[in-house]
Amino acid sequence: MTRHAHSTDRTALAGERGFTIIELLVAVTIMLVITGAIFAIVDPSRSTARAQPEVTDQNTRMRVGLDTLSKDLVMAGAGTYSGAIAGGLANFFAPIVPFRMGTLYPAEYLDRFHPDRITIAYVPNTAAQTRVRDAMPQPSSEIKVDAQPGCPAGDALCGFREGMRVVIFDDSGAYDFFTVTEVQTDALHLQHRPPINPDDFSKAYTPSENARIAQVETHTYFRDPATNQLMHYWGDNNPPEPVTDQIVDLRFEYFGDPEPPTAPRPLPGGTNCLFDGAGVNQLPILPSNGSSLVELTPAMLSDGPFCGNVPNQYDADLYRIRRVRVTMRVQTGLRD
C-alpha cells in the first residue's frame, strides 16, 4: 500500500512541470519576430496614408497650373472680328512672347528669351474694337475712334470705358498696351506703361497704316524660384498673383511654321521687319524634313530681325509660332 501511494505522488509532480529557460527564450524570440513583422507591415501603410493626401494635392496643383495655362494659350492671338477690321493679332504683332511684359517689367524685352516665362495676348469677346479715325499728332495725343458697324448703338466710343485694358496696333508691327483713364464724347484719354514716358506710346498711330484699337487681355506666366510658385501677371500696376505652389520647374518650348510669315505687310514701297522695299520676305524657309512644324530654338527667337518699337520689340520669328509645349514639374509638401 505504501509503495502504491508513493507512485501516485510522483505522477502528480511530473504533470506540474514548467518551461525551461531555453524554451522561454525560444518563445520570446518567436514572439518578437512575429511582432516585428507586424510592425514592418503596418509602418509602410502608415507612411502611405500620410503621403496619399500629398499625392492628391500634387495632382491638383499640376491640374490647376496646366488648365490655367491651357485656357489662355488656346485663346492666344484671337483678334478683332467686327466688320472690315477683322483679323487675328498674329497678322499685326506677335501675340506670344517668351518674356514678361507690362508696367512692372518695362525692360525685359531686352533679354529676348526666357525658357520659364511667357506673355500671351488676345482680344476677348467684346464690342470695344474699331479703327483709329484721325492721325495722332504726337505719341502722347488722345485717340479718336470710328463708330463703325458693330459698335453699340448710340455709343460714339464703341464700347470703350474707363479702366479698360486696350491694345493699339497697325500694319508696321508696332503695338502698345494701355489703360483707358478718361473718356470723352469722341476721344479716349489714355495711360499706358513706362519706361519712356508714362503718357507716350511707342509711336504716333495713323489711319494710313491701318491703325486699330481693341479691348485686350494679356496674361504673363512665370515661375518664382524664391517661392516655387506659378505666378500670373495682368500687365498693369498690380503685383503678380500666385496660381499654384510647389512648382520646381517650368519650361516653354515653341514650334512653328517653317514657311516665313506673310503678314504684316508694309505700305507699297515701305519696309518692316519682314519685307524689304521690293516686297521680298527677309526670313528664310526653315529645314523641316517634311514636318508641318519645326522647333523654334531660343537662338532663333532672339537673334533678330526685331519688329515693333521700343519698348515693345520682339523677334520676327515669333510670328511663326503655332504650338507651345508646357513642361511643369511639381513636388509634394512632405519634408520627411
Task: State the predicted function of each range.
Residues 3, 17-70, 74-76:
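Aliphatic-rich helix starts adjacent to a transmembrane/signal segment
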